[in-house]
Structures are given as C-alpha cells and as structure tokens.
C-alpha cells in the first residue's frame, strides 16, 4: 500500500493545500495530513483547531486521514508507515528550501521518498501567511479557503 505523508503547519489550511490533498488522494492509497505543532512559528490556531479544520476540509475524501504531531518528522513518517513525503512547490523560491529539506529527510529516513507537486495555477499564489494577513485586516478570503476556515478566521479576528 502506498502511503503518503503531507506535513505542514496548515495555519490555516487553504484551497491550495486542499488542491494538493485531492490530487494526492487520487495518486496514493492513503494520504496522511500531518499537522505540525510548530510552536516556534507561534501559530494563530492551536494544533487541535488546525487538525479539526483540516478534517473538515478533507472529510469528503475517504482515503485521507489528519493527524497532529510534535515529534521529528523523520520519526513520525516511520511511525505512520508512510513511504513518501509530499511537499508543495508554489514557486521557484520554494524549491531551494524544499530541496534542502528533502535531502535532510533522505538522510534521516532513507526509505522514504520525497515527491513535489505544484498547485493548480489558480491556487499558486495562495499562502497561509497571506490569508491570515488579509483576514486580520477584514478582507474577503472566501476565494482562498474553505467556508469553515473562513468562519474560524472571522471568529478569531472579531473586532
């Protein structure tokens, strides 16, 4: 069984993430969305909230599972018995960091391959950071996130 692990902070999960997850769900038997605790990033939403939002966004995909984690990714991927890391590349600027990360992961988990997918063109400019900034300033984010995520952001930034 081909199991792919798609790690990220997902703060919040966007339609760009959702696009990659849907496509991965067609390519792999089982997709694990690994929501990282990432305390150094000081996330807007708690780990539990980010897991719940990712579950809501992916509930229509029967072969997708959402799991939170706070351990070393190389250990977590083995624990989850995944054989592929999935990473998204929005632009060339993402490649250098992702290439470095893939090589480090190869050292730490040599049996796990890294696979890169680019988002559909209509989502290539979306980032969680931009979504948070637009939401914080009262902008319309409905084109960029699932309605449940838009509601959570509106609640978070209530004035």
Curated annotation (Swiss-Prot):
The record marks 17 as: Transition state stabilizer. Its cofactor is Mg(2+). Keywords: ATP-binding, Coenzyme A biosynthesis, Cytoplasm, Magnesium, Nucleotide-binding, Nucleotidyltransferase, Transferase. It catalyses: (R)-4'-phosphopantetheine + ATP + H(+) = 3'-dephospho-CoA + diphosphate. Pfam families: CTP_transf_like. GO terms for biological process: coenzyme A biosynthetic process. Pathway: Cofactor biosynthesis; coenzyme A biosynthesis; CoA from (R)-pantothenate: step 4/5. Its main location: cytoplasm. GO terms for cellular component: cytoplasm. GO terms for molecular function: [citrate (pro-3S)-lyase] ligase activity; ATP binding; pantetheine-phosphate adenylyltransferase activity. It is an enzyme of class 2 (transferase). The keyword Nucleus does not apply. Substrate binds at residues 9, 41, 73, 87. Gene3D superfamilies: HUPs. It comes from the Bacteria. It is found in: Cytoplasm. Its EC number is 2.7.7.3. ATP binds at residues 9-10, 17, 88-90, 98, 123-129. NCBIfam families: coaD_prev_kdtB, cyt_tran_rel. Homohexamer. Reversibly transfers an adenylyl group from ATP to 4'-phosphopantetheine, yielding dephospho-CoA (dPCoA) and pyrophosphate. Belongs to the bacterial CoaD family. This is Phosphopantetheine adenylyltransferase.
């Amino acid at each position: 069984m081909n199991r792919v692990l798609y790690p990220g902070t997902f703060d919040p999960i966007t339609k760009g993430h959702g696009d990659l997850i849907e496509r991965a769900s067609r390519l792999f038997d089982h997709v694990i969305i690994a929501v990282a605790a990432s305390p150094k990033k000081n996330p807007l939403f708690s780990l539990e909230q980010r897991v719940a939002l990712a579950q809501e966004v992916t509930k229509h995909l029967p072969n997708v599972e959402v799991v939170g984690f706070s351990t070393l990714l190389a250990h977590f991927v083995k624990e989850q018995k995944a054989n592929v890391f999935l990473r998204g590349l929005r632009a060339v600027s993402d490649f250098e960091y992702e290439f470095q990360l893939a090589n480090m992961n190869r050292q730490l988990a040599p049996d796990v391959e890294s696979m890169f997918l680019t988002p559909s063109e209509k989502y290539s400019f979306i980032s969680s950071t931009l979504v948070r900034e637009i939401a914080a300033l009262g902008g319309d984010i409905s084109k960029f996130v699932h309605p449940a995520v838009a509601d959570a952001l509106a609640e978070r930034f209530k004035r």
